[in-house]
Amino acid sequence: AVMQVASRRTEIRTLAGRKCRFPMRELMGYSKTMKPSIHVDKLEERWRDILETPEEERPNNWKDLNPAKYQVAFVYKSLNRLIQASAADQTKKAMKDCMDNGHWPMLTVHDELCFSIEDDGQVAAIKELMENCIPELRIPSRVDVGLGTSWGSAK
């Protein structure tokens, strides 16, 4: 369903409603014979032309140009974009909720937040805020906590 929405609208919406675009339904080339970026509509048009051409006059790489071959890449790209962007939305919301409650992260790396902790009560409070930052999720979020004297030694 995500692929059809992305293909039809050239965009998808993240968990927080943020718009992620798919410019002109472009796909990266996955063979040596293709240019770095190809517009799907042009690929489909070229495929129709190839099928109308007698087989002996078709280019050597004509089977590589089948648009169905690239549908898997488009599905992967649209799902990956949705998952990664929604995870970023969730991390931003968790950061905001933590800051609103007086817990300021010192460092963020992708989906990890590093806090300076003074007592165990802060750990439980931060963990609960992060796990419940988007309560409408059907699958609950789980937060792994690592403690240490430095970020590298946290376990």
PLM feature segments, named:
Residues 1-155:
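Conserved catalytic core of nucleotide polymerization and phosphodiester-bond processing enzymes
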